[in-house]
C-alpha cells in the first residue's frame, strides 16, 4: 500500500478557513500600520546562516537549538528565517537604504524554529513584523508601543493583554550589571540548570529569562538592572514613561524582562495574556541601536521594532469574518454551457464573484451550491438562452425572477 504522506511535525497546512482568519488579522494590522506611515516589504525566507548567527548571537536559544540551518548544493550554510529583524537590517544595508532614513517597514510571512510543538507554538508559524529604522529617542519608542496597542485594539484583543515593560539600559549599564549578576550567580553555580551554567559564561542576563523553576528561584533575589543604569539610561527610561503616561498607555514595569536576542538595548517590552497557558507572549520587541553595525554597516543606526504571532492572535478569540457570497450559475444542459459562460464573464467583469457549476446532475449541483451558503443561483436553460434572459433565484427569500442581464446585475449589486 502506498504511504500516506503527512506534513512535517509542527508544520501545519493553512486550510481556507484558517487562511481567512490569517488574512483578516494581516489586513487589520496592515491598515493600522498605514495610519502610522509604515510601508510593506518582503525579505527572502532563505538567507545565509551568518545573517542570523551574527545578529542573534551564538548563545541564543534560536541559534544554539532552534534554527533550521543546512549546507546547500554550493556548500554554503543557509537557513530558513527564524525571525524578521535580521533579514530586514541585512536588506537595509545591502540595498543601500541609509539615505532614505527614517524607514517604517511592515512585513509578514512564515518563520521557522525547531521547537517542541504545542498549542500556540509550531515549527513553522507566521508573524506580523514592524521595524522603525532611524528611530531615535524615547518618543519613537512611545509611538511604537502605541502602534502595537492600536493593532491589538483593531484585533479586539488589547483588553486581554498586559504590556510588560523594562529598560535594558545602555552598553555601559549592562556591562556593570552583568558583572554584579555573575558575582551573585557564582554562589549558586552548582544549583543552576545546565543551560544556565553555559549562559553564565556567554550571556548571564539570559538566565533571568530561564524557564527552569530552580533558576527562577535563584534569580528572584538577584540584583536588579535598574540599580546599574547610567544617568543617560535612567533619563531615557524616565522620558519614555512620561510619554506613555501622556498617551494614557497602561503598563507594568517588569525588572526581570529581558529579550531573547543579543541585539537589544534600552526599551524592551512584551504584551502577554493569561488566555493561552504557557504561551503567554502575543507581541514582543524592543530597541536595537547597535544591530546595523553588527550586520556590517559603517555606523550604528537607531531602530526599534516588534513582532506578533498570528497563530497566537487567532487563538485569542473567534473572529466573525463576513465573506463574499458568490453567485452560482447552473446551465441546465450541455447546449447551455456556452451561454452560461458568457453570463459568468459579464458578471465577473462587473466585480461580482461568480462560480459556474456545469457538470453533473442538477440535484447534486444544487446540493453543492447549498453547501456553500449561496444567496443567488442563476439557471440557464433553453428558454433563457433563446430569449437572451436569466432565471435568477434568491435562496434567502425563495423568490425567482426571469430578467435580462442589466436587470439581473441591478438586483445582484445590491448584495
Swiss-Prot record:
It is an enzyme of class 6 (ligase). Its EC number is 6.1.1.21. GO terms for biological process: histidyl-tRNA aminoacylation. It comes from the Bacteria. GO terms for molecular function: ATP binding; histidine-tRNA ligase activity. GO terms for cellular component: cytoplasm. It catalyses: tRNA(His) + L-histidine + ATP = L-histidyl-tRNA(His) + AMP + diphosphate + H(+). Keywords: Aminoacyl-tRNA synthetase, ATP-binding, Cytoplasm, Ligase, Nucleotide-binding, Protein biosynthesis. It holds the Pfam family tRNA-synt_His. Its main location: cytoplasm. InterPro entries: aa-tRNA-synth_II, aa-tRNA-synth_II/BPL/LPL, Anticodon-bd, Anticodon-bd_dom_sf, His-tRNA-ligase, HisRS-like_core, HisRS/HisZ, HisRS_anticodon. It is found in: Cytoplasm. Belongs to the class-II aminoacyl-tRNA synthetase family. Homodimer. HAMAP family: His_tRNA_synth (MF_00127). This is Histidine--tRNA ligase. It comes from Rickettsia akari (strain Hartford).
Amino acid at each position: 500500500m502506498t504511504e500516506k504522506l503527512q506534513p512535517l511535525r509542527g508544520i501545519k497546512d493553512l486550510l481556507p478557513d484558517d487562511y481567512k482568519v490569517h488574512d483578516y488579522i494581516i489586513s487589520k494590522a496592515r491598515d493600522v500600520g498605514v495610519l502610522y506611515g509604515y510601508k510593506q516589504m518582503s525579505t527572502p525566507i532563505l538567507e545565509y546562516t551568518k545573517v542570523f548567527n551574527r545578529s542573534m548571537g551564538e548563545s541564543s536559544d534560536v541559534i544554539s537549538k532552534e534554527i533550521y540551518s543546512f549546507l546547500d548544493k554550493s556548500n554554503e550554510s543557509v537557513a530558513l528565517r527564524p525571525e524578521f529583524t535580521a533579514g530586514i537590517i541585512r536588506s537595509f544595508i545591502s540595498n543601500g537604504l541609509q539615505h532614505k532614513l527614517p524607514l517604517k517597514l511592515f512585513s509578514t510571512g512564515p518563520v521557522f524554529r525547531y521547537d517542541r510543538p504545542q498549542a500556540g507554538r509550531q515549527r513553522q508559524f507566521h508573524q506580523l513584523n514592524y521595524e522603525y529604522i532611524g528611530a531615535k529617542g524615547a518618543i519613537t519608542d512611545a509611538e511604537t508601543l502605541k502602534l502595537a496597542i492600536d493593532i491589538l485594539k483593531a484585533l479586539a484583543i488589547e483588553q486581554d493583554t498586559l504590556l510588560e515593560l523594562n529598560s535594558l539600559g545602555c552598553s555601559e549599564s549592562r556591562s556593570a550589571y552583568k558583572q554584579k549578576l555573575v558575582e551573585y550567580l557564582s554562589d549558586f553555580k552548582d544549583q543552576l540548570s545546565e543551560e544556565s551554567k553555559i549562559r553564565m559564561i556567554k550571556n548571564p542576563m539570559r538566565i533571568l529569562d530561564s524557564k527552569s523553576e530552580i533558576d527562577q528561584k535563584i534569580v528572584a533575589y538577584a540584583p536588579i538592572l535598574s540599580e546599574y543604569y547610567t544617568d543617560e539610561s535612567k533619563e531615557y527610561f524616565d522620558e519614555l514613561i512620561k510619554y506613555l503616561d501622556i498617551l494614557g498607555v497602561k503598563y507594568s514595569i517588569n525588572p526581570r524582562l529581558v529579550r531573547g536576542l543579543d541585539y537589544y538595548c534600552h526599551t524592551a517590552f512584551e504584551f502577554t495574556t493569561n488566555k493561552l497557558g504557557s504561551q503567554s507572549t502575543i507581541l514582543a520587541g524592543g530597541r536595537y541601536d547597535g544591530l546595523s553595525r553588527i550586520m556590517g554597516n559603517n555606523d550604528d543606526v537607531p531602530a526599534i521594532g516588534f513582532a506578533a504571532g498570528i497563530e497566537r492572535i487567532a487563538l485569542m478569540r473567534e473572529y466573525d469574518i463576513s465573506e463574499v457570497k458568490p453567485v452560482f450559475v447552473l446551465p441546465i444542459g450541455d447546449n447551455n454551457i456556452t451561454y452560461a459562460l458568457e453570463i459568468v464573464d459579464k458578471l465577473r467583469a462587473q466585480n461580482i464573484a461568480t462560480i459556474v457549476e456545469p457538470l453533473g446532475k442538477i440535484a447534486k449541483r444544487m446540493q453543492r451550491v447549498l453547501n456553500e451558503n449561496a444567496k443567488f443561483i442563476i439557471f440557464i436553460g433553453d428558454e433563457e438562452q433563446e430569449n437572451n434572459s436569466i432565471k435568477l433565484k434568491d435562496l434567502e427569500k425563495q423568490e425567482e425572477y426571469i430578467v435580462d442581464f442589466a436587470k439581473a446585475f441591478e438586483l445582484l449589486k445590491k448584495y
